[in-house]
């Protein structure tokens, strides 16, 4: 897509299972590892962090100026999205190639125990922060009933902590396939309004 402006954006969408699917938890850890943990409800985004793989591979190397990932807990299968703001000195194809290279790396090389521990810790912290008061706990219990049941909320941290490197590699290969994604690119046309 082309239009007025000076900034190029890319959004990549992969299919993502429902929150009650067993693959949801390894994919949530993979999201935390790649882009920083997501706030799993539809009303909030995730956080970007400088320790994530995509930040180091794309922002630090100046392919993009920002990268965010996002997954939502839903009753039906939905999407996992990665949104990038392309660096002004780069072409969108370069940013997408760098993203693909990093995704291929997680598919082929086992994630280290340290990375998994950090990713789970970050996802746990975001979940704890999002459910620290009684209002948010009530929201999560009700929201969990919509897509699974209240037990999902009560066992979320336990299931997250059980994710292994093998689980992450398996879901990366299953869900992050180039042929199973949609890529949208906004290419600015400076001088047009």
Where are these regions (language model features)?
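M16/insulysin-pitrilysin zinc metalloprotease superfamily fold
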Residues: 37, 48, 72-130
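Buried hydrophobic packing residues in well-ordered domains
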Residues: 12, 28-30, 58, 82, ...
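Short, flexible turn/loop "capping" segments at secondary-structure junctions
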Residues: 3-5, 72-79, 149-151
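C-terminal regions of mature proteins
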Residues: 83-85, 106, 114-193
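A structural supersecondary motif
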Residues: 11-13, 35-86
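An aromatic/glycine/proline-enriched structural segment found at the starts
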Residues: 1-20, 130, 185-193
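Second-shell loop/turn segments in exported
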Residues: 13-20, 41-44, 81-90, 103-110, ...
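Extracytoplasmic
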Residues: 5-9, 53, 62-64, 77-79, ...
């Amino acid at each position: 897509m082309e239009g007025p402006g000076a900034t190029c954006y890319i959004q990549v969408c992969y299919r993502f299972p429902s929150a009650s699917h067993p693959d949801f938890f390894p994919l949530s850890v993979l999201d935390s590892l790649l882009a920083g943990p997501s706030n799993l409800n539809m009303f909030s985004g995730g956080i970007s962090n400088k320790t994530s793989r995509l930040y180091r591979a794309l922002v630090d190397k100046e392919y993009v100026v920002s990268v965010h990932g996002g997954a939502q807990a839903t009753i039906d299968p939905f999407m996992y999205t990665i949104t990038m703001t392309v660096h002004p000195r780069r072409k969108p194809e370069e940013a997408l190639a760098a993203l693909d290279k990093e995704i291929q790396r997680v598919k082929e090389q086992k994630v280290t125990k340290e990375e998994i521990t950090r990713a789970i810790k970050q996802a746990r912290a975001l979940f704890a922060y999002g459910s620290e008061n009684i209002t948010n706990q009530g929201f999560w219990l009700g929201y969990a009933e919509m897509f699974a049941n209240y037990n999902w909320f009560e066992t979320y941290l336990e299931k997250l902590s059980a994710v292994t490197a093998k689980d992450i590699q398996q879901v990366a290969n299953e869900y992050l396939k180039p042929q199973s994604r949609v890529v949208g690119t906004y290419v600015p046309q400076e001088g047009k309004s």
